[in-house]
Regions:
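Phosphate-end processing signature that detects enzymes handling 5′-triphosphorylated RNA
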Residues: 48-419
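Low-complexity, prion-like intrinsically disordered regions of RNA granule-associated mRNA regulation factors
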Residues: 1-52
C-alpha cells in the first residue's frame, strides 16, 4: 500500500472497526507517562530521537509582553461614574486554539459605549505613542546590547504593526479569565511588568479585508506597489541548536524544483504591545523583534538543508503545499522537518512603511495540525532603521510613529471577523 503522510489520511467511510481491548495496566501506565502533557513525550520526532523546542516563539531576556484596552480601564469600576463602556468577555470561535485547548478563547467586547468613551483618533494615537515609545527605546537598547557579532549572521531590528484579535485563555490550574483579572493585567502593564495573562493574537482576517486593503486602502495611504511573491518556508530542527528552528525561505524554479533563497533563525521578540481596540472590529499589535539571517553556513548544515529542500515534492493537495517521500523528512540523527509554510503575498510601500498582504497555508509536522490564514502586516522600516542608531531621538521617533498608527487606526481595523 502506498505511503500517505498524516495530513492526507482520512477516516474510512465504511463501518467503524470494533473497539479494541484496553491495554494491560502496566502498558497503560507506560503510555500515560508518555502523554503529550509529559516532558518525556512532548515535542519529539522520528521515534523520539529528537527533543524539539517546546516553543517556536523566542522572547529575549527582559522582553515585555503586555496588554491593555483602549479606551483604558478606569482605576476601579466605581470611579467611572458611567463614563467607562460596559464590557464583557465573549467566546470567540478560533479553530487553531480550540484544537489545542478544547475550548473557545475569549475576546473583550464593549456592549455599550460609556458617556465619554468613544474618543477621537488623535486621542487614541497619542495614548498609544506615549505608552509605547519609552519601552520601545529601552527594548531597542537591550536588543543592540545583546548582539554578539558573528561573521555568519546578519542581525536586524524589525518593528511591525499587525492587525487581528486579542484572545484570552484560562490556563490549567489557574483562576478563570475575568474582567477583574484583565483589569489587574492592564494595571501591571502600566508599570512595565510583563503580563501574566495567557493571550494570543489571532491574525487571520477575512478575504474581504485583503481585497479592500489592496483596492482602496493602499491608495489612501499613498503606497506604491512593491512586489508580489510566492515562497515555501521549510522549518528545520537542528539537534545541535535545540532552542531554535532554522527557516529556509524557498522559491520555485522554472523546472518546478525548490531553491533556497534565504536562511534564518527564529525571530527574537523584545517588546510586544497588544491593544484591544474596543470600538473597532480588529485589534492592534506593535512588536519589536530581531531578525537573524544566516549569511554563511557550516558545510554540514548547508548540505543537510539542500538535501531536505531538494527532496520536497510540491503538492497543492496537502497542507503547507509540500510533502516528502517516506524516510526523506530527516537527515541522520541531527536534522528533521518540523513544519512548512506556503505563502503568497503582495507588498506596497513608501520610504518609511511597507504593507504586506499575505495568504499563508501552514502545516506543523509535530502536531499534524494545519492552518490557512490571511494576514496584514505593516513594517515600520523607517523607524527600524532609526532604532539602529547609537542614540535614537525620541521626538523624531514619535513623529514617525504617530502617522503610521493613525493610518492603521483609520484604515485597517474596521473589518469584522465573522465565525
Amino acid at each position: 500500500m502506498a505511503y500517505l503522510p498524516p495530513h492526507k489520511r482520512h477516516p474510512s467511510s465504511t463501518a467503524s472497526a470494533p473497539t479494541p481491548n484496553p491495554p494491560p495496566p502496566s502498558l497503560s501506565s507506560s503510555l500515560r507517562s508518555l502523554s503529550l502533557s509529559s516532558p518525556r513525550g512532548r515535542g519529539r520526532v522520528g521515534g523520539g530521537r529528537h527533543p524539539l523546542p517546546s516553543n517556536k516563539i523566542i522572547h529575549a531576556a527582559g522582553c515585555i509582553s503586555r496588554w491593555s484596552p483602549l479606551p483604558p480601564f478606569f482605576p476601579s469600576p466605581e470611579d467611572s461614574d458611567g463614563e467607562e463602556p460596559t464590557l464583557r468577555l465573549e467566546p470567540f470561535p478560533c479553530d487553531p486554539i480550540e484544537r489545542k485547548t478544547g475550548a473557545k478563547p475569549l475576546a473583550l467586547v464593549a456592549s455599550s459605549p460609556g458617556q465619554g468613551s468613544s474618543g477621537s483618533t488623535a486621542t487614541a494615537v497619542t495614548a498609544i505613542a506615549e505608552r509605547f515609545l519609552p519601552d520601545l527605546l529601552a527594548a531597542a537598547k537591550r536588543a543592540k546590547a545583546s548582539y554578539a557579532p558573528k561573521e555568519e549572521e546578519l542581525v536586524k531590528l524589525n518593528l511591525v504593526a499587525r492587525v487581528g484579535k486579542v484572545l484570552f485563555q484560562t490556563q490549567p490550574g489557574r483562576s478563570p479569565v475575568s474582567l477583574e483579572t484583565l483589569r489587574q493585567a492592564a494595571k501591571a502593564g502600566e508599570g512595565g511588568s510583563k503580563s501574566q495573562l495567557h493571550k494570543s493574537f489571532y491574525t487571520n482576517v477575512p478575504n474581504e479585508c485583503l481585497d479592500d486593503m489592496e483596492q482602496s486602502v493602499v491608495k489612501r495611504m499613498a503606497l506604491e506597489f512593491d512586489s508580489s511573491k510566492e515562497h515555501y518556508h521549510v522549518k528545520v530542527f537542528d539537534k545541535h541548536h535545540s532552542d531554535s528552528t532554522i527557516s529556509c525561505k524557498c522559491t520555485v524554479e522554472e523546472d518546478g524544483s525548490l531553491a533556497i533563497h534565504k536562511v534564518e533563525w527564529n525571530k527574537v521578540r523584545h517588546l510586544v504591545e497588544d491593544i484591544s481596540c474596543l470600538f473597532k472590529d480588529l485589534d492592534l499589535r506593535l512588536m519589536l523583534c530581531t531578525k537573524r539571517i544566516l549569511k554563511t553556513l557550516d558545510p554540514e548544515v548547508e548540505n543537510a538543508l539542500k538535501s531536505l529542500v531538494s527532496s520536497a515534492v510540491i503538492d497543492p493537495d496537502v497542507k503547507g503545499g509540500l510533502r516528502w517521500p517516506l524516510g526523506k523528512e530527516s537527515i541522520g540523527e541531527r536534522f528533521s522537518i518540523v513544519g512548512v509554510w506556503h505563502t503568497n503575498y503582495k507588498a506596497f510601500r513608501n520610504e518609511t512603511l511597507r504593507l504586506k498582504l499575505r495568504h499563508g497555508d501552514r502545516f506543523d509536522h509535530q502536531t499534524s495540525a494545519g492552518e490557512v490564514s490571511n494576514e496584514v502586516t505593516f513594517k515600520l522600516i523607517g523607524m527600524s532603521r532609526r532604532l539602529e542608531d547609537v542614540d535614537p531621538e525620541e521626538t523624531s521617533l514619535k513623529e514617525m510613529l504617530e502617522p503610521v498608527v493613525q493610518m492603521v487606526w483609520d484604515n485597517a481595523l474596521n473589518y469584522k471577523i465573522v465565525p
